[in-house]
């Protein structure tokens, strides 16, 4: 009965015991089930934290604080491709293995963090996870692993400090970071967790426990047989105050009981290491997350080395706390996010839209599977018909017979005279349909190009070729929040008045939706002769505020690109762009 009751309340049974959950007080807590419901709280920006390559590019300004990536590996055309992340490194196979020899110890891991392997070179032999392996077998292993995932990376092997251990076992420091308004990131929880399970050494520690040192003790009944379940997590933990970094309590297990202790026992060196470095660590975490206001919640894993600390992972879904309560501010933030999501998903209009979207995608998949060659992205199936319809209506100078021939061979009819396509030479061309069928050539890493903010971070090394990004306006805590971005002048704040000041200073600035194309939702904000203009029409401050405060859209305030007179003479009503297609046949060499 107690087990069923726990599940009904949204907890695992032992969580109910630890937090003393009853029917009267359960609404005061954010349950484990509710916490899982918050997965994906970072929305479309969750993609920044699910792949080590993407994460390192987003946070490239802090590369010295992150795990260093040496190589990325993936399979293309049945062959293993090596991409060197450092220009000084060669991407030739022999050079790759010579580099491993030189480093002596490296990690081979999936880019999604799910698997990692230790590769060492010692005594003139290679070792994989401490087992000797020939270079031929190692090559085969890397090839087979690259075939099972989207890609692999070769990274540095971060060696922890001799002091960074719990009960003699290796440990990791975990931080839960949140940013409720996009401006003030903070640590919501901080603890060190033993990387392995309970040991004989720990049992000896448990024997030394005195009653006066016990803060609380919970009976821990095993309900789950799976070792990796949330409830059966057996690792010792040391919790710290998230504001000061001071030691709070030590969590150990003794028999069937989980015990909170005041005393640190044999872990004084680790405690001092964290406490002495907390101020620097907290400052660094705040500095990092201030640069990514789009990220609202993240888990950060840290390893302390002999030379400082390194961030080994930044991910979307921090672990639910099983031993102590979240602080009030962090708890309120999580509760607000939960309530907001529940309200949205209960909305009838939203439910109808979700149902319609799912039904549409299902129809697309069915239609694509039934009527098209295998491999077509489902939504293209209907778009291709739409393109044919538009082409049929618009190009009236092309005979009906010619149009039908073009459609049967995958071309839109206007392409025929444009490229001189005939019945004799059409096989020399890639048809419109074939090009659509190829989507998405970039596979997973197409996420880099899906919105304007992501590409700005990814390509920040070439910032001078991008418009300046001044502000990002997005919904936070129920209200639109104006968040200064990387190019915002230091003397400006984060109000609508500051955006007007920026327009007065620059003369022209651009207001555009973060996720949009074809100029939809674009405004040119101009200040001239003491008057404001939107798209060259006189406007008031209220007109501008009404656009930017629309909660249904995220807006970017950027530099307005003024084109040269030569292009302006062609058409001055918009920016006339030059489109360039770049491809990399070998995955490395860019070709126009």
Where are these regions (language model features)?
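Conserved catalytic-core segments centered on acid/base and nucleophilic motifs
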Residues: 110, 176-177, 300-304, 310-312, ...
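Conserved N-proximal alpha/beta basic substrate-recognition cap immediately N-terminal to
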Residues: 1-99, 112-114, 366, 370-501, ...
């Amino acid at each position: 009965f107690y087990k069923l009751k726990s599940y009904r309340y949204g907890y695992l049974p032992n969580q109910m015991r630890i937090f003393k959950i009853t029917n009267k007080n359960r609404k005061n807590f954010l349950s484990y089930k509710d916490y899982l419901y918050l997965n994906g709280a970072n929305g479309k920006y969750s993609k920044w934290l699910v792949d080590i390559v993407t994460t390192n590019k987003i946070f490239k300004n802090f590369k010295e604080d992150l795990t260093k990536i040496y190589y990325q590996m993936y399979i293309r055309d049945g062959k293993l491709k090596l991409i060197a992340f450092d220009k000084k490194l060669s991407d030739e196979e022999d050079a790759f293995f010579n580099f491993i020899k030189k480093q002596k110890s490296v990690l081979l891991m999936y880019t999604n963090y799910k698997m990692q392997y230790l590769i060492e070179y010692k005594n003139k032999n290679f070792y994989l996870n401490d087992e000797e392996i020939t270079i031929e077998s190692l090559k085969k292993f890397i090839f087979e692993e690259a075939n099972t995932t989207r890609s692999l990376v070769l990274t540095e092997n971060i060696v922890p400090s001799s002091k960074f251990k719990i009960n003699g076992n290796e440990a990791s420091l975990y931080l839960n970071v949140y940013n409720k308004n996009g401006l003030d990131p903070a640590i919501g929880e901080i603890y060190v967790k033993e990387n392995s399970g309970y040991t004989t050494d720990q049992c000896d520690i448990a024997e030394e426990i005195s009653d006066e040192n016990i803060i609380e003790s919970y009976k821990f009944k095993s309900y789950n047989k799976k070792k990796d379940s949330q409830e059966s997590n057996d690792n010792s933990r040391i919790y710290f105050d998230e504001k000061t970094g001071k030691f709070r309590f030590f969590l150990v297990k003794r028999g069937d009981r989980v015990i909170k202790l005041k005393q640190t026992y044999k872990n004084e060196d680790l405690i001092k290491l964290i406490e002495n470095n907390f101020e620097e660590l907290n400052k660094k975490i705040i500095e990092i997350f201030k640069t990514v206001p789009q990220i609202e919640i993240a888990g950060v894993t840290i390893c302390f080395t002999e030379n400082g600390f390194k961030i080994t992972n930044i991910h979307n879904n921090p672990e639910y706390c099983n031993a102590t309560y979240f602080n009030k501010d962090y708890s309120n933030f999580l509760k607000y996010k939960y309530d907001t999501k529940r309200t949205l998903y209960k909305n009838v209009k939203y439910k109808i839209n979700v149902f319609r979207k799912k039904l549409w995608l299902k129809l697309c998949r069915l239609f694509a599977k039934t009527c098209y060659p295998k491999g077509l992205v489902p939504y293209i199936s209907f778009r291709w018909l739409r393109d044919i319809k538009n082409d049929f209506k618009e190009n009236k100078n092309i005979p009906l017979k010619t149009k039908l021939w073009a459609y049967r061979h995958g071309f839109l009819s206007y392409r025929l005279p444009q490229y001189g396509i005939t019945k004799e030479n059409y096989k020399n061309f890639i048809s419109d349909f074939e090009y659509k069928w190829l989507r998405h050539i970039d596979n997973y890493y197409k996420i880099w190009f899906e919105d304007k903010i992501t590409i700005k971070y990814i390509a920040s090394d070439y910032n001078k070729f991008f418009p300046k990004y001044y502000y990002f306006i997005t919904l936070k805590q129920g209200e639109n929040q104006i968040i200064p971005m990387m190019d915002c002048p230091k003397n400006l704040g984060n109000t609508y008045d500051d955006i007007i000041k920026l327009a007065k200073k620059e003369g022209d600035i651009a207001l555009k939706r973060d996720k949009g194309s074809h100029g939809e939702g674009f405004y040119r904000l101009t200040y001239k002769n003491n008057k404001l203009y939107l798209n060259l029409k006189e406007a008031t401050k209220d007109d501008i505020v009404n656009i930017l405060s629309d909660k249904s859209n995220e807006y970017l305030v950027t530099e307005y690109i003024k084109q040269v007179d030569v292009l302006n003479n062609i058409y001055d009503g918009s920016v006339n762009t030059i489109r360039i297609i770049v491809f990399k046949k070998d995955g490395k060499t860019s070709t126009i």
